[in-house]
Design a protein with these regions (language model features):
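Beta-strand/loop-rich accessory regions of lumenal/periplasmic or secreted enzymes
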Residues: 1-248
Length: 248
């Protein structure tokens, strides 16, 4: 995904017009190459190359390294696009649809409330929440529920079974970075398309977003001021998401 549901601040600052192309860039990206490599006798690497639906056709790679025990390392890379004057990116990462029963979230990051690049007012710790509690019922549905500086997160059903997502090292730099994430009963697209809360349907799935980064939410005012420059994501700079996935 390269998009987030617009906030009231985004609309007031004109971000909808400026960043409209990012709403479709990831949603309609097309796979242009697949590469499968055995890694010895116990693991395999599968790399998908996607072409973003923008004029520059920037290529993003998604690499899965899976072993026979079910452990998966996921590496998602955006190289930065210096051709053309692209607007800054709202968000970059992966959004998955999960069965509706996987609504519980435990994470090690800053919380327990939602946090953003320019709203890190919370404490670092291990927090328990759920997809329904994390969704703020704004009059106009919008971006909500993000958690920053996450080291690991566990998404579970009421029986305690689920998925663990944890930070891992980048294969090229060796650097390990925290990630941003959210678990909500609605996708970014569903939140963006609804004009009122009662237009959101009864939840049938959960939506897990795991992001390399997301721009800030601003708030100097809600009718003109943009997100401060240091909390935006320049399109000409690379972005990398590196996480490990384990079922339990």
């Amino acid at each position: 995904t390269t998009f987030r549901a617009l906030t009231d601040n985004d609309r007031g600052a004109g971000h909808a017009f400026e960043r409209a192309q990012w709403a479709v860039a990831g949603k309609y990206a097309r796979c242009v190459d697949t590469k499968v490599e055995p890694l010895g006798e116990t693991a395999v690497s599968v790399t998908y190359t996607y072409e973003l639906a923008i004029a520059q056709r920037t290529k993003v790679t998604i690499r899965y390294v899976a072993d026979v025990l079910g452990h998966v390392d996921l590496h998602v890379a955006y190289p930065g696009e210096k051709d053309g004057d692209l607007p800054t990116i709202p968000a970059f990462g992966i959004e998955w649809m999960l069965p509706v029963e996987y609504s519980n979230l435990r994470f090690y990051g800053v919380g327990p409330e939602e946090t953003y690049a320019d709203r890190k007012h919370a404490k670092l710790g291990i927090w328990d929440t759920n997809a329904f509690r994390d969704r703020a019922p704004y009059l106009l549905p919008q971006e909500t529920g993000n958690h920053e500086d996450v080291r690991w997160a566990e998404i579970t059903d009421d029986s305690g079974h689920g998925l663990r997502v944890s930070q891992t090292a980048n294969t090229e730099t060796g650097v390990t970075k925290p990630f941003a994430m959210s678990l909500l009963p609605y996708s970014s697209t569903m939140l963006e398309e609804a004009l009122h809360q009662d237009e959101l349907p009864e939840p049938k799935h959960m939506f897990l977003r795991v992001l390399a980064a997301q721009m800030g939410v601003g708030g100097d005012d809600s009718w003109m001021s943009p997100v401060h420059e240091q909390y935006q994501l320049p399109a000409d700079q690379p972005l990398n998401l590196d996480v490990a996935l384990d079922l339990f």
